From Swiss-Prot:
Belongs to the TRAFAC class translation factor GTPase superfamily. Classic translation factor GTPase family. IF-2 subfamily. One of its GO terms (cellular component) is cytosol. Residues 217-220 are annotated as: G4. Residues 117-124 are annotated as: G1. This is Translation initiation factor IF-2. The keyword Cytoplasm applies. Residues 163-166 are annotated as: G3. GTP binds at residues 117-124, 163-167, 217-220. Residues 253-255 are annotated as: G5. Keywords: Cytoplasm, GTP-binding, Initiation factor, Nucleotide-binding, Protein biosynthesis.
Length: 607
């Protein structure tokens, strides 16, 4: 034996990979990952260290029996703390007073894996092969395609694959604050190498900060060139292990099954190093993978259990929606009564279809669920108001970070040709300075997509377009998510925009612009919102979150913000001249006869 892989040695010696890496660090042996090889001399040293470690344990085995007795006095403290925690419990199920277990006492959970890549590179074929060979016969009939995820059995344990196509679905989940996947598999065809969607998939995985494994598919084809793929990956600063980097690259064939066993092994090894754990006895939390309406059953939602255990009969809260679980189905299509961590289940019981990526929590009962939803609705309205205010007050420092620090400008680039993309990247590289870093999260050919908007919204990036324009749906989505899309057909104008972002030579200048005027004709007392000014708009228009000035006679008695507008019982954004409305100010001393003037801060276009 001249050389051996680290994970193979760990398996032979019955040692966890993490412990093996600790020993190698102590010996000063360099390695890239657990798939790196080590010399026979190093193997002998490791065996010697492990033998020495096991010897003292045998000698000291007698006094260990005292540990339980020593731990007993702590029990009354745990019991006494329980009532206090019960009183502090909120409507959504939260941790109870039992002492939190140490990290090493929390059991490991199965890794959750998503597979992404360019169309026709074999993502679906690879999933189908794994499903066919690693899932029980009763599960392999296509049922799992409706559940949105499936479980594969390996020698190392269970692996959960998310069966939701497309990296945009993956980013949709992350955009709502949930990281459902632990590992991302990037599938690249050996005869095609890197394609636009491949680069996008890699960018999305990097933005999510999840470990990546590259599966070079279709190696069975005569024209397959895996080495070209590895070389092309280095252009994205992704260096395969064979080239001295730390990127795991596995040649596979979804057609013949070649390399699939190795891929599953690497997934298990990566999961072990990530030390994935979840407490099945803790409070429940999960994520919506997908939701749909079934003609016969009604609303169905696929939930990935992340913490705790889900039971039939539990009340679940998702955003401003709730439901009681009437039935649960596992990835095999069988009815189950409970599901623990890293288990995908299809849930029947919601009245509305929940959105992908929404976080799920359990509630004690229906009343508690309704209370949570009401509170969340209030929070949402406050956030909408704050977001609208920020749109008129956003400064260069908000975009780039505090002055005096190294600031990062996140960008998504879109252009009409590859040559234009490369030219823009070259220009941006020369624009970086000591105090400013330019991070091009994604550069591609063609008009910006909804996936670009999702990526930009999660990373607070600006989308710059050269000679391409976004579609109406993409523009609307960007407006809703507060993402700036700027399109140019002259390269120098785009460069000027980059200069404004980087150097800050031109900071935004705002001026106050008159909107409208209203008379207060009655004051409406509201238990939650305080006093609302029942008013008639005599001139111009009123807009929610606009600035407000209240005058009484010749005296200005209030200056602030319009926090809400109502027409009858409906919340509205605008009210025009000649209409009555309720104006909610962050102020309760409004009186009948007062005059309210509305204005807004508008950015002045500069030469």
């Amino acid at each position: 034996m001249s050389k051996v892989r680290i994970y193979t040695l760990a398996k032979d010696l019955g040692v966890e990979n993490a412990r093996m890496l600790e020993i190698l660090d102590g010996l000063g042996v360099a390695y890239k990952s657990v798939s790196s090889t080590i010399e026979e001399e190093t193997v002998d040293l490791i065996k010697q260290i492990l033998e020495e470690e096991s010897a003292p344990q045998a000698q000291d085995s007698t006094p260990v029996a005292e540990t339980p007795a020593a731990a007993q006095p702590a029990a009354p403290q745990a019991a006494s703390s329980q009532p206090a925690a019960a009183q502090a419990a909120q409507a959504v199920a939260e941790p109870v007073a039992a002492p939190e277990p140490a990290v090493n006492e929390i059991p490991h959970r199965a890794p959750v894996v998503t597979i992404m890549g360019h169309v026709d590179h074999g993502k679906t074929s690879l999933l189908d092969y794994i499903r066919k060979t690693r899932v029980a016969a009763k599960e392999a009939g296509g049922i799992t395609q409706h559940v949105g995820a499936f479980e594969a059995k390996t020698s190392k344990g269970k692996i959960v694959f998310i069966d939701t196509p497309g990296h945009e679905a993956f980013t949709t989940i992350r955009a709502r604050g949930a990281n459902v996947a632990d590992i991302a598999i990037i599938v690249i065809a050996a005869d095609d190498s890197l394609m636009p969607q491949t680069r996008e998939a890699i960018a999305h995985a990097q933005a999510a900060k999840v470990p990546m494994i590259v599966a070079i598919n279709k190696v069975d084809l005569p024209q397959a060139d895996p080495e070209r793929v590895k070389t092309d990956l280095t252009q994205l600063n992704l260096v395969p292990e064979e080239y001295g980097g730390d990127l795991i690259v596995v040649p596979v064939s979804a057609k013949t099954g070649e390399g699939v066993e190795d891929l599953l092994e690497y997934i298990s090894l990566t999961a072990e190093l990530e030390d994935l754990r979840a407490d099945p006895k803790g409070p429940f939390s999960g994520v919506i993978i997908e939701g749909k309406v079934d003609r016969q059953a009604g609303v169905l939602a696929t939930v990935m259990v992340q913490e705790g255990t889900l039971h039939v009969g539990d009340f679940l809260v998702v955003g401003e929606n709730y439901g009681k679980i009437k039935a649960m189905t596992d990835s095999a299509g069988g009815r189950i009564k409970e599901a623990g961590p890293s288990t995908p289940v299809q849930v029947l019981g919601f009245s509305e279809v929940p959105a992908s990526g929404e976080k799920v929590q359990s509630a004690k009962n229906e009343h508690a669920a309704r209370d949570v939803i009401a509170a969340r609705a209030d929070v949402r309205r406050d956030q909408e108001n704050a977001r609208d205010r920020r749109k008129t007050q956003r400064t260069l420092e908000d975009i780039m970070g505090p002055i005096g620090e190294v600031r990062t400008v996140n960008l998504v680039l879109r252009a009409d040709t590859q040559g234009s993309v490369e030219a823009l990247q070259g220009i941006l590289a020369r624009k970086e300075g000591e105090d400013v870093k330019i991070n091009v999260m994604l550069a591609g050919i063609g008009a910006p997509t909804e996936g670009d908007v999702l990526l930009a919204s999660t990373a607070e990036a600006t989308i710059l377009c050269f000679s391409v324009t976004p579609s109406g749906s993409v523009t609307k989505m960007a407006e809703n998510k507060g993402v700036d899309i700027k399109s140019y057909r002259i390269i120098y104008e785009l460069i000027d925009e980059v200069d404004r972002l980087i150097k800050g030579n031109v900071e935004p200048v705002f001026e106050e612009r008159y909107l409208g005027r209203a008379e207060v004709r009655m004051v409406i007392r509201h238990p939650k919102s305080g006093n609302i000014a029942g008013s008639y708009v005599t001139d111009g228009m009123f807009r929610r979150n606009a600035k407000a000035k209240v005058t009484r006679g010749k005296q200005t008695v209030y200056e602030g913000t319009i926090v809400g507008l109502k027409r009858f019982k409906d919340d509205v954004r605008e009210v025009q001249t000649g209409y009555e409305c309720g104006i909610n100010l962050d102020w309760n001393d409004v009186m009948e006869g007062d005059i309210i003037e509305a204005s807004e801060m508008v950015e002045v276009e500069q030469a």
